[in-house]
From Swiss-Prot:
GO cellular component: cytoplasm; microtubule
Skewed-composition ranges (Basic and acidic residues): 409-425, 450-461, 484-515
Region listing for Disordered, in residue ranges: 340-515
Localisation: Cytoplasm, Cytoskeleton
One GO biological process term: cytoskeleton organization
Record-linked InterPro entries: MAP70
Chain's role: Plant-specific protein that interact with microtubules.
Alphabetized Pfam families for the sequence: MAP70
Coiled coil ranges: 26-106, 136-351
Keywords from the UniProt entry: Coiled coil, Cytoplasm, Cytoskeleton, Microtubule
Polar residues bias spans: 345-362
Protein's UniProt name: Microtubule-associated protein 70-4
Amino acid sequence: MGSLGEVVEHGVSKDMLPFDGHPDPVVDELNRLENLLREKDRELGHAYSEIKGLKVTEALKDKAIAELTKELKKQDEKLSSLEKQLEQKNLDVKRLSNERKEALSAQFAAEATLRRIHSSQKDEEVVPFDAIIAPLESDIKAYRHEIALLQDDKKALERHLKLKEAALVEAGNILRSALERALIVEDVQNQNIELKKQMEIYHEENKLLEKSNRQQVLDIERLTHTIAELEESILSTGDVANAVRFYQNQAAKLNEEKRTLERELARAKVYVNRVASTTANEWKDDADKLMPVKRWLEERRLLQGEIQRLRDKIAMAEKSAKAEAQLNDKLRRKLKALEDDMRNESSNTSASNKDNATSKQATPKRSSSQPRRPIISADGADKRRPASQPRASVSGKVLNKQPGSETEAAEKNRHAAAKRFDSPRSAKSVAAGGRGERPVRSHLWAHRSKVADDAGKENKEQNPNYKAHLGDSHADGDCGVQCSEHEEAMDLRKLDEGKADDSDAVKSTKDSCEI
């Protein structure tokens, strides 16, 4: 069991650690069961040693009982012989007592005869007294001698009886001790039977523990399979997490591009205001006073279209960030569910078979429901970008091209506007648009012109006296400056509103990502 525990510990410690870095509950359960088996083995060893000691004591007690039985038999034989001797001595005592009584009666009869003789001698004085008494005295001496012998025999018999009584007392004590030992032997035999029953119970428990150990080994193998499947699912979720990080990086890049574009827009607005003021001052004395203002308005409309397009791009990035946050939440919930399943499997081994069957049925569904990783181009950008959205690099290049002086900027704007409206490329693009084959560049400029037209309509709706105001300002010679100031104020308001909306959107996306 120790080797199996070591193998399981080495195998599980490297490959079966849970996600939180804590030890595996399956390994803890195996260690606990191994400790229980070791304790049961120790108890069995103690029981075996006790049984051996009890067997030795039983053998010694059997030998002692055999010796005691032999001694009891000898004592019984001695008692039987002593009883026979006592009976014989009692018979002798009775015989002697009868003889004594007879001797006493003969003595009394002799005394009576002597009295009669004395009385007759006194009367007749025929026979002498000594002649009659001498044989009787000899008889009396003989009887007295026999009586003394009988008394000695009686004393000896009394002593022998006392010795027999002491021997009987000792034999009774020996019998009591033998009975006590027999009771102890019976108790030991009962304990031996109980220990045998406990041994059988321990053997059955050992068999059950071995079966449970085998079942747990099978459960561990199943858990290793499920852990391998979970690792595969975690790797797939890692791919999804990489995709989520990629989209988060894209969102961060888009936010940075947004900030840079906002800065470039602010610089462009300042630059456009300066150009408008210089062009208005330059064209103040000529006949074509409204031409630079119209061109400035066109450039402004184009810039507003680019701003709107960038806002749409930011909105798309925010939507993608929200979708990524939702994916992250779903993946976290799935991981929590998987951890709960693992804990339930480790705690309830009986229910682990059912959970393994359900998890085996549920894992392919999870792998099929996981989103695919998007195909990323070499530049790191997503290929799902619509063709109508321009790249930030193009707008940055357009806005970053600022001349050194204000006069050179005004002249370049004039030439650029003339080339845009008078170049053959624009004519070709218009023709292609009529045929239904429009390139991406012309499509971008067409979209900008639409947005610019919408902005112009909004400006006209906001300022109903726009033409009258322009006429008055041109009549006074201050059209360019007033129009530029009015448009600058409108642009600042719109920029402030857009920045507030964008900052709220970015905060919401950051909060969702952090959650």
